[in-house]
Amino acid sequence: MTHRRILAGCIPLRWRELIVGLVAANCIGIGWGRAEPPAKPKPRTSAMVRDEDRNFRLYVKSWTELPKENVVLQQRDYSCGAAALATMIRYHWGDNVTELQLLLEVVKMLSEEELKERVKNGLSLTDLRRLAVRVGYEAAIGRLEFDKLRESKIPLVVGIVVNKFDHFVVYRGMDDEFVYLADPARGNVRTPIAEFKKQWQKNAVLVVVKPNGDLKKISPLLVSGEELFLGELNRRYLRDQTTTKFVPY
């Protein structure tokens, strides 16, 4: 992939509560390809829990459902940018857009020569910003220091490098050890903070905001307390299984 210069737009005043320290940035592009609408989510499984005083139904998410929940998975090798943007629009702002619909807008947005260049070198973060604006959103690109990333109150599209390949994901939040991502290729994943810092491309972010949208809405795309709790349980389990226990004679 080739590097491209991109210019950050002015960050609207109403976004300053969400992001602090956005300035002009560079980011590496990513390719795109054809896509199909993501499969409809399967209905939740349920289990009855009983006691002497009352009955109630508890909906249980299976382990196979959790990694793919609230993520638009890319349908082609190079469609992660469109899938990441679709994830933001669908699961944070609530508009039922598909990866394929966004890719068709890319075809309308770019000239024939530009399309040939993008097929060869990939979409840039600037292309995703233009695409977001084209489908009715406010969008801006900037650079954000890592310490300020935690303060974001909305998800952000970011570029990372994984195994020497450029890739777009959605930043969802972090705890003291991990950064949580909605990855169009892998689903919901968490990456150790030190590793994410190495992967993050030039600290560039894409902010996408729905006009007149609620900036403080509760979003299913943001990291939930349940996820953080499950993560802590996993850490404790692994620690207990890998720590040698010495029992005195």
What are these language model-derived features?
Residues M1-R4, M88, Y180:
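Short amphipathic alpha-helical segments with coiled-coil-like heptad repeat character
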Residues H3-I19:
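Bacterial N-terminal signal peptides that target proteins for export
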Residues E17-G29:
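Bacterial N-terminal signal peptides
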Residues G29-S111, E232-R235, Q241-Y249:
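Active-site-adjacent structural segments surrounding the nucleophilic cysteine of cysteine proteases
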Residues R34-E36, K40-T64, V106-V209, D214-I218:
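Conserved active-site-adjacent core of cysteine acyl-enzyme catalytic domains
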Residues N203-Y249:
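Low-complexity, Gly/Ser/Thr/Pro-rich intrinsically disordered linker/tail segments
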